[in-house]
Amino acid sequence: DIDTPVFSKRSGVTVDNAYETSFKLIDDLKADYGMSTEVAAGFVGNLWHETGGFKYMQEIRPLVKGSKGGLGFAQWTGKRRDNFESYLKKEGKEDTASYDANYGFLKKELDTTESRVLKKLEGISNIKDATKVVSETYLIPSKKYAKIDERIEAAEDILKRYNEDRSLTDEDN
């Protein structure tokens, strides 16, 4: 359950599963794409915003009447949702909320159809610019619902907690 507090696997500090997901995403984006911690946190802050802190993997009130709405970490809609569902079927994954399913599809997109966001992130070193680039290039929400300040706030909060978690872990070593 994502609302149940847990001990951080790294530092022993109590965090909820949503932050554990955030920290894992940062680590994976850094490892797979060479992103700085700040840029990765900007990416994750957007996904946090899209899902209400990784609580809602299915869009609650779809904006497009009659549509299935967004699904997954990036609230993929339309053709991208169809591609996510096809990916799940092909990979034999049934849980649309699982980390492996969502990160696997995110990675597939970044390696292929959505690689332009990685190019735009090159040379960016601050969290605000990274958050804006991911929102405007990868997620592309309607202007009415973009709420970039909330995305940046989420990214900054995640970065702060990530750095605190990692510094506590480093002190233990």
Tell me what each language-model feature is.
Residues 3-27, 32, 51-126:
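Peptidoglycan-targeting cell-wall enzymes and recognition modules
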Residues 40-44, 70-73, 103, 131:
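Extracellular structured ligand-interaction cores
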Residues 50-51, 110-114, 138, 142, ...:
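A generic secondary-structure signal for well-formed alpha-helical elements
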Residues 35-36, 94, 165:
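Short coil/loop linkers at secondary-structure junctions
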Residues 1-5, 166-173:
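Generic secondary-structure boundary/helix-capping signal
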